[in-house]
Amino acid sequence: MDNNELVICQGLTKNYGKKTALNNLNLTLGRGQFIGLLGPNGSGKTTTIKLLNGLLQPTSGSVLIDGQAPGTYTHSIISYLPDKNYLNDAMKVNDLISFFADFYTDFDRVKATDMLDSLQIDPLSRLKTLSKGNQEKVQLILTMSRKAQLYVLDEPIAGVDPAARDYILSTSLSNSSEDASVLLSTHLIAD
């Protein structure tokens, strides 16, 4: 493994019964790269992301993140944004920030607060009182406020307006360190 290679997928295949969701994927992602997974719904983007995060086991092939199979170590260096809301929507935004700061040692509370201010999201709001787009922005803020080596974003812009989409993409590009990599999936070709 080259020291610059952060993600290596070799012959990655995932079947669900007789249906093949992913067939023999070979992918290398170097440090500091921004890669987009583009494809229609059902093309294997989320399956690939779940395999990278160790949430699924491959039918065949292998995944290495920083030289390790998905597990405890890789979870500590990956900041993952799933395609569905996973947060407790009864919590206030500032409580979610505190929760992430307590849970992740690499969480940057100042960065999260600055991004909330930029998007004019009230930290005292309960998540469920925010629009769908603002809920997605909060999830992205929490994900991008970690000092991770790899940011894995599954359809982060699917439900937001075009102006917010631009902010999210620029945030994804500008708020990670120079050596961090970003893997973003989308089915929207304009992105």
Regions found by a protein language model. Give the residues of each.
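Conserved structural motif at the start of ABC-family nucleotide-binding domains
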Residues: V7, L22-N24
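The feature captures the beta-strand-to-loop junction immediately N-terminal to the Walker
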Residues: I35-P40
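Helix N-cap at the start of a conserved alpha-helix in ABC-type nucleotide-binding domains
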Residues: S43, P162-A164
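Helix-to-loop junction immediately C-terminal to a conserved catalytic motif
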Residues: N53
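Conserved ABC transporter NBD signature motif
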Residues: S60-T74
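ABC-family P-loop ATPase nucleotide-binding domains
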Residues: D83-Q139, R146
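Catalytic Walker B motif of ABC-type/P-loop ATPase nucleotide-binding domains
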Residues: Y151-E155, V160
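Helical segment within the ABC ATPase nucleotide-binding domain
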Residues: R165-E178
